[in-house]
Amino acid sequence: MTLFPQEAAPWGFLLLAALLTWLLLALLLPVLRRRLLDQPNARSSHRKPTPRGGGVVVVLVGTVLAPFCGWGPPSWLPFLCLPLALVGLVDDLRDLPAGIRYAVQFLTAVVLLLVIPSTPLPWWLMPLGLVAITAVINFVNFMDGLDGLVASCMIVLVAAASLGPGPAAGAALAPMVGALAGFLLWNWSPAQVFMGDVGSTFLGALFAGLVLLQPDPIRAVGLLLAAFPLLGDAFFCVLRRLAAGERVFQAHRLHLYQRLQQAGWSHAHVT
């Protein structure tokens, strides 16, 4: 019996990850309420102080369990994204300078492009790849502003990526799907905990890596199209703000999901 089997039944690991995440968050919530309480402001979608940083449990459970259900690119991909989670956690605790955050995002993008065994990009396309990956990281972070939105979308996207060839790929991604599901039980409206930068930036990089891992361009484009409701909102909002001469990274309430919520839609209906 090997520690890292070539394949494993994904459902058991999915359920285990969901249960572990739910239980660990139950234990961690009192600490987060003392140390990482997000106070509502004019740009917030929530109306009462809510702890953030719960994504740290998703990162830990989904990453640690992945190798036990199949060793391969999908199981070591989360480890490549851990530096972003660490910087995101520090940023949740105390605001980091933007330069540090973007530097780690850039380095993570470089690592993903160099390490993932996908079709190598021509050298002249590398800058475009770096921009695309860092954009996805930030887009997922931008969209983490409504109860259950990013967590539920990422469940669908990671599960869709697991449908690729080879049973180990599906099994290796099962813990991340389960961890997201366990987190969603706490994050669904009215949310008792937010993901925080520790979770959203990690998941953005993870999704970018999963796109790069697709065996052919058709599957990669299909995965991107599945993410369009999430990433498209952020993309077009950035374009509008650039056209208006506004600062892209300044907090605002101009995303489609924010406008729908302001128009009276509930968090659950928008999600």
Regions found by a protein language model. Name each.
Residues 43-46, 262-271:
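Membrane-interface alpha-helices at helix entry/exit sites of multi-pass transporters
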Residues 2-235:
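"…together with the soluble PPM/PP2C metallo-phosphatase catalytic core" -> "…together
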Residues 55, 226-263, 267:
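Membrane-proximal soluble regions of multi-pass membrane proteins
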